[in-house]
Amino acid sequence: MSSSKALQDLIPHGYPIRGCFGCGADNAHGLRIKSHLECDEGVATWKAEPHHQSFTGFLNGGIAATLIDCHSAVTAIALHCQEIGLDLDGENAEFPDGWTKTITIDYLRPTPLEAELTIRAKVVKRGKKSRTVACSIYADGQECVRAEVVVVIPSAG
């Protein structure tokens, strides 16, 4: 997958996931994260806005969970596509269905609202029709949130 486009922007128009609050390219009111593959890891940077806060100056935990959910799922699906040789950036590209089954989150420290966040996700286990992803959110080089996410990919089996 050599495209410089964000993974979310490779999802064909008309797919329902494009309206997702967290990662939907067509949701003007959503978080609109942009994930990219760097070797075997999904990486995104994202900047919160004032309305994403919990306590003054800190990111809301639900927003952090949404960032992890969406980034982990799109990373798992894109890496699956890479494994099977499916081109996501071609004229007739298709994006396999997938969804988050479970998320286990550890909030390690408050996530500062003003920092540019880096989100990193890596597949750590392959099941027959699922991928387990380790995902973390970093602010100023410090890990703030760590999660394990199980993503179901029906076409993987």
Can you name each region flagged by the protein language model?
Residues M1-P12, T102, R109-G157:
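HotDog/MaoC-like acyl-thioester-processing domains
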Residues M1-T56:
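Non-catalytic linker/capping segments at the edges of enzyme domains
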Residues A28, G98-T100, S130:
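Short, solvent-exposed coil/turn segments
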Residues D40-G42, G61, W99-I103, A115, ...:
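A generic structural signal for short beta-strands and their flanking turns/coil linkers
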Residues V43-E83:
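A conserved, well-ordered hydrophobic junction motif at loop->secondary-structure transitions
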Residues W46-A48, Y107, I153:
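Hydrophobic residues in beta-strands and at strand termini
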Residues C70-S72, L79-L86, T104, A139-G141, ...:
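Low-complexity, flexible helical/coil segments
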Residues T75-T118:
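Hydrophobic beta-strand-centered segment that forms part of the acyl-chain substrate-binding groove
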